[in-house]
A protein has these predicted regions:
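A generic structural signal for solvent-exposed, polar alpha-helical segments
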Residues: 9, 27, 39, 51, ...
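Negatively charged, low-complexity tracts enriched in Asp/Glu with abundant Ser/Thr
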Residues: 1-39
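Intrinsically disordered, low-complexity regulatory segments enriched in Ser/Thr/Pro
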Residues: 50-81
C-alpha cells in the first residue's frame, strides 16, 4: 500500500518512531522501518519511507512470517488496500499529517 503525507514539519524518522515503528536501515535515500504485532516479531508491518522535499512517501505491507525459503524472491506479505492495511494506513495518516496552523 502506498500513500503520501504532504508538508511534514519534523524529521521523517522521528515521526515514524512516534507512530511505533523501529528504524532498520537506509538504502539510497529510502528508510526501512518495522512495527511488530507480536512479541515473536511476526506478523509485522514493514514500511519504506522516502522524503521528497517536504513530502513523505510511504510504502508498506504486512509480513505474516519470516522468510523461510533461502534466496528466493517470494514473500509472505499482504499488500491489499483493505482490512488491516487500510486501518494501519488510516492510523498513520492521523499521526503523521501536520495539524493546520491555528489563529489566536
Amino acid at each position: 500500500m502506498k500513500f503520501q503525507i504532504n508538508n511534514i514539519t519534523e524529521n521523517a524518522a522521528t515521526l515514524l518512531r512516534r507512530a511505533g515503528y523501529t528504524f532498520q536501515y537506509e538504502d539510497h535515500g529510502e528508510m526501512s522501518f518495522v512495527r511488530p504485532l507480536a512479541t515473536a516479531g511476526y506478523p509485522r508491518y514493514h514500511l519504506y519511507a522516502k522524503t521528497s522535499g517536504l513530502n513523505l512517501e510511504i510504502s508498506f505491507h504486512l509480513d505474516q512470517k519470516a522468510h523461510t525459503y533461502g534466496n528466493e524472491t517470494r514473500h509472505h506479505g499482504e499488500y491489499e488496500n483493505e482490512g488491516a492495511l487500510k486501518q494501519e494506513a488510516d492510523r498513520l495518516k492521523s499521526i503523521l499529517t501536520p495539524l493546520p496552523p491555528t489563529d489566536y
